[in-house]
């Protein structure tokens, strides 16, 4: 595990650039990224192991619930302090890209209600272009149960988010974007996710897919394999998801997945991550973090990685930027990093960019 200070020491050629001199330019020319996923507002609750056992959901799982179960959980934890943030996996990823200065947009569906308005405003606040459709259903919400070890268990009422269908996917929405990042949770609707991936590919996008959750992979194993083989260029998975997909250990899993797409990423928590493309294999160590809540860690890793990739960084640098973003978000409750933390990551991106520019000239 590396502290950020140690990280820069291990990169002396980069560290020679004075952080006070290098300035981040939001107009820097880079590829545009489009996210597609469930538009969900997260309700974050810190609970005990006993609370989680009583509810009966496996720790670390993603569980779809109906409106009745949603109301029951709300009532069960009525006295617990709640923290609301606009979330959803792909939305978190593109928000990260936008915060780091990238150009990003998000496609999802919300209700015509206060929660939906909050969601739209939050995207714009984070410099993400909202390409949102509306539904007569209530906006989707996700109750995130966070145990003392920082692990999170999702109880998701999709609501309007689940009202996004294949017929809503228009090729015009993909025009002008270079990368399309899709969350694996959409695999619950086979027609929707296949239409989205196929349309993105037809419009010339590099297609990125996050495998979402091990139980989603288990329930849709062969369908996911077919999707990846036909449409996907970049796959993100954590250790549990990669095992569900390949039944292999992480190092073997990243090799197996990379045989089916262009770039494979397997995240292994405190042990860092593996990134593979062809014969290139990189192991990126984690940075030192005081883990409070792992919500969004994988999403921010993907955001940091894709931002760096869109900026022309090599694979190791992409993994390092993803690692730093993930390492910082686990230190807070929720997924919204404070501005000073974003500034820290932006400066590192600028250092890398300045170093690459110096190498060229």
Can you say where each PLM-predicted feature lies in the sequence?
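Conserved phosphate-binding/catalytic region of the ribokinase-like
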Residues: 31-40, 46, 53-59, 64, ...
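Short hydrophobic targeting helices and cationic amphipathic motifs
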Residues: 7-12, 17-19
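Glycine-rich phosphate/adenosyl-contacting loop at the front of the ribokinase-like
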Residues: 26-105, 361
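Substrate-binding N-lobe of the ribokinase-like
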Residues: 69-141, 348-351
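Conserved phosphate/ATP/ADP-binding segment of small-molecule kinases
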Residues: 203-206, 211-283
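Conserved phosphate-binding/catalytic loop of the ribokinase/pfkB sugar-kinase fold
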Residues: 131-134, 144-187
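Surface-exposed amphipathic alpha-helices with a cationic face
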Residues: 98, 197-201, 258
């Amino acid at each position: 595990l590396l502290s950020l200070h140690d990280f820069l020491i291990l990169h002396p050629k980069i560290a020679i650039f004075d952080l006070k001199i290098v300035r981040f330019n939001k107009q820097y020319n880079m590829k545009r990224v489009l996210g597609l996923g469930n538009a969900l507002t997260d309700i974050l609750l810190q609970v005990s192991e006993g609370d989680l056992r009583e509810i009966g959901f496996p720790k670390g799982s993603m569980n779809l619930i109906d409106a009745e179960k949603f109301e029951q959980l709300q009532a069960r934890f009525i006295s617990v302090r709640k923290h609301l943030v606009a979330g959803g996996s792909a939305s978190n990823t593109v928000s990260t890209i936008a915060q780091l200065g990238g150009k990003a947009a998000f496609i999802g569906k919300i209700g015509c209600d206060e929660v939906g308005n909050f969601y739209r405003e939050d995207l714009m606040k984070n410099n993400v272009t909202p390409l949102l459709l509306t539904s007569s259903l209530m906006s989707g919400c996700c109750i995130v149960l966070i145990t003392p070890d920082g692990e999170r268990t999702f109880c998701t009422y999709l609501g309007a988010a689940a009202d996004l269908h294949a017929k809503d996917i228009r090729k015009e929405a993909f025009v002008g974007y270079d990368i399309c990042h899709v969350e694996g949770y959409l695999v619950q609707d086979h027609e929707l996710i296949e239409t989205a991936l196929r349309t993105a590919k037809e419009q010339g996008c590099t297609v990125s897919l996050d495998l979402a959750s091990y139980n989603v992979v288990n329930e849709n194993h062969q369908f996911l394999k077919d999707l990846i083989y036909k449409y996907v260029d970049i796959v993100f998975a954590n250790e549990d998801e990669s095992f569900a997909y390949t039944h292999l250990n992480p190092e073997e899993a990243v090799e197996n997945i990379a045989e089916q797409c262009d770039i494979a990423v397997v995240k292994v928590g405190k042990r860092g991550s593996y990134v593979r493309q062809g014969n290139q294999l990189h192991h990126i160590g984690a940075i030192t973090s005081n883990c409070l809540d792992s919500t969004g860690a994988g999403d921010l890793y993907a955001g940091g990685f894709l931002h760096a990739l869109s900026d022309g960084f090599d694979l190791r640098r992409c993994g390092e930027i993803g690692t730093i973003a993930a390492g910082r978000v686990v230190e807070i409750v929720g997924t919204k990093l404070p501005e000073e933390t974003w500034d820290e990551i932006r400066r590192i991106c600028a250092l890398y960019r300045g170093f690459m520019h110096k190498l060229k000239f």
